[in-house]
UniProtKB/Swiss-Prot annotation:
The keyword tRNA processing does not apply. This is Ataxin-8. It is unknown whether this protein exists in non-SCA8 individuals. The keyword Nucleus applies.
Length: 80
């Protein structure tokens, strides 16, 4: 009887060790996910800045076109 009881106790200890290992793996996975999220946020910010710059350039081009049109009108008046 005594021998059988000892064997059962050893098996239970082994099971506990396995559970601990699984918990450690889960923690590592969570850390990796957090890092990925941070990287994505940084990329989004950069993209927004680039878009703003492009919009400013377009506005400048439009202003230049308007100036050219005014010059053409003045020339026509002089010819008349």
């Amino acid at each position: 009887m005594q021998q059988q009881q000892q064997q059962q106790q050893q098996q239970q200890q082994q099971q506990q060790q396995q559970q601990q290992q699984q918990q450690q793996q889960q923690q590592q996975q969570q850390q990796q996910q957090q890092q990925q999220q941070q990287q994505q946020q940084q990329q989004q910010q950069q993209q927004q800045q680039q878009q703003q710059q492009q919009q400013q350039q377009q506005q400048q081009q439009q202003q230049q076109q308007q100036q050219q049109q005014q010059q053409q009108q003045q020339q026509q008046q002089q010819q008349q």
